[in-house]
Amino acid sequence: MVRKYRKAKGIVEAGVSSTYMQLRSRRIVYVRSEKSSSVSVVGDNGVSSSCSGSNEYKKKELIHLEEEDKDGDTETSTYRRGTKRKLFENLREEEKEELSKSMENYSSEFESAVKESLDCCCSGRKTMEETVTAEEEEKAKLMTEMPTESEIEDFFVEAEKQLKEKFKKKYNFDFEKEKPLEGRYEWVKLE
């Protein structure tokens, strides 16, 4: 007994169940074969992807077909919630794996291409390794040229003397001896 249902895009035989979903931005058709545990997804743009599961997954699955319209133009498959969730999880995992594999391949290809281009066309220029070692040498050179403790102490002693001299001129007061000096301010001792 082979019954055919007319779908939005194509014909589906009775031995194959399918789900038609209308999302906000696109339509998705899920086609599942009863003989195998594979699932194919056909998007609105015509791109299809597939996912396969184990035999236990197939046995646990309940599929009920319902006709939406009386004339039989469209149909939907209603899965148990857990089955839908597993279907989407499997699809997401597969997409993530494919993406990570393609990114790994791309990055390794890019690195090898960069090395080859540096080796063949830039023989007069510094390579990445040479640049890194030059920067490390500069850092090491700066570390060896650090001032000693006595030089640092002398620097701050001189700065402190200059600051005291500045206050002495500005406020006409000797802060070391704590005595007023002659100048624009007149100091009065408080009792």
Swiss-Prot record:
Region (Required for inhibitory function and interaction with CDK kinase complexes): 162-191
Region (Disordered): 62-81
Location of the protein in the cell: Nucleus, Nucleoplasm
InterPro entries in the cross-refs: CDI_dom (IPR003175), CDI_dom_sf (IPR044898), KRP (IPR044275)
GO CC terms, sorted: nucleoplasm; nucleus
Tissue expression remark: Expressed at low levels in roots, stems, leaves and flowers.
GO molecular function: cyclin-dependent protein serine/threonine kinase inhibitor activity
Primary localization: nucleus
Post-translational modification remark: Ubiquitinated independently by RKP and SCF (SKP1-CUL1-FBL5/SKP2B) protein ligase complex, leading to proteasomal degradation.
Annotated keywords: Cell cycle, Nucleus, Protein kinase inhibitor, Ubl conjugation
Phenotype reported upon loss of the gene: No visible phenotype.
GO terms for biological process, alphabetical: lateral root development; lateral root formation; leaf development; negative regulation of cyclin-dependent protein serine/threonine kinase activity; positive regulation of DNA replication; response to abscisic acid; shoot system development
Effect of residue 86 to A: Affects transport to nucleus, but does not abolish it
Impact reported for residue 84 to A: Affects transport to nucleus, but does not abolish it
Lineage top rank: taxon: Eukaryota
Induction pattern: By abscisic acid (ABA).
Protein family per UniProt: Belongs to the CDI family. ICK/KRP subfamily.
Other remarks in the entry: Plants overexpressing ICK1/KRP1 show altered morphology (including flowers) with a reduction in plant size, cell numbers, pollen germination, seed production and CDK kinase activity. Trichome cells misexpressing ICK1/KRP1 show reduced endoreduplication and cell size, and undergo cell death. ICK1/KRP1 degradation is regulated by the AXR1-dependent RUB conjugation pathway that is required for the function of the SCF complexes.
Quaternary context: Specifically interacts with CDKA-1, but not with CDKB1-1. Interacts with CYCD2-1 and CYCD3-1.
Purpose of the protein: Binds and inhibits CYCD2-1/CDKA-1 kinase complex activity. Regulates cell division which is crucial for plant growth, development and morphogenesis. Functions in turning cells from a mitotic to an endoreplicating cell cycle mode. Acts cell- and non-cell-autonomously to regulate endoreduplication by allowing S phase progression, but blocking entry into mitosis. Keeps on the one hand the plant cell cycle locally controlled, and on the other hand provides a possibility of linking cell cycle control in single cells with the supracellular organization of a tissue or an organ.
Protein's name in the database: Cyclin-dependent kinase inhibitor 1
Source organism of this protein record: Arabidopsis thaliana
Gene (UniProt): KRP1
